[in-house]
């Protein structure tokens, strides 16, 4: 009887490992398709495939794949439609606020800090000439922010990414 239980346990373990290997293979297959679409300069295909990867990863609660898919998808969306940056930032802000895993939350806050810093740097000339009308009220649209508001937002996300650093 014990021998049978060991065999059953071993069998279930092998099935579990096999399923996780299948998941990894399916991600590998999808990422290879993304790579081929990149080489062929097919941004719409990259966006579609990374959207599929994101949905699959979300169902499986696979945060690393979700993050990777988000970064790729957002990058290609912004190349096609630069205004998508603003929606992408809002989505990532929501994700960072609702994320329960401290490691994933820290990564998201770090990515957000980088995105805001990159935006600030690429629009520095315009921002330097902008006059703050009401410092206490931050506009919903980042295109209306002052450089001070960007610095505060970047600092907020950097601090949030390090908030649980002892446990990370």
Q: Model-derived features: where do they sit?
A:
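Extracytoplasmic/secretory-pathway proteins
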Residues: 27-33, 37-168
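Bacterial Sec-dependent N-terminal signal peptides
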Residues: 1-30
């Amino acid at each position: 009887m014990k021998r049978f239980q060991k065999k059953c346990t071993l069998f279930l373990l092998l099935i579990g490992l096999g399923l996780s290997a299948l998941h990894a293979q399916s991600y590998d297959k999808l990422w290879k398709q993304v790579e081929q679409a990149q080489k062929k300069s097919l941004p719409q295909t990259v966006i579609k495939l990374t959207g599929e990867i994101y949905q699959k990863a979300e169902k499986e609660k696979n945060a690393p794949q979700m993050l990777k898919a988000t970064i790729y998808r957002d990058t290609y969306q912004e190349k096609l439609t630069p205004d998508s940056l603003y929606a992408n930032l809002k989505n990532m802000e929501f994700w960072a606020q609702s994320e329960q895993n401290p490691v994933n939350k820290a990564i998201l806050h770090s990515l957000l800090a980088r995105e805001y810093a990159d935006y600030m740097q690429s629009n520095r000339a315009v921002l330097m000439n902008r006059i703050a009308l009401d410092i206490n009220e931050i506009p919903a649209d980042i295109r209306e922010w002052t450089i001070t508001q960007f610095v505060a937002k970047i600092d907020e996300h950097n601090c949030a990414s390090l908030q649980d650093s002892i446990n990370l």
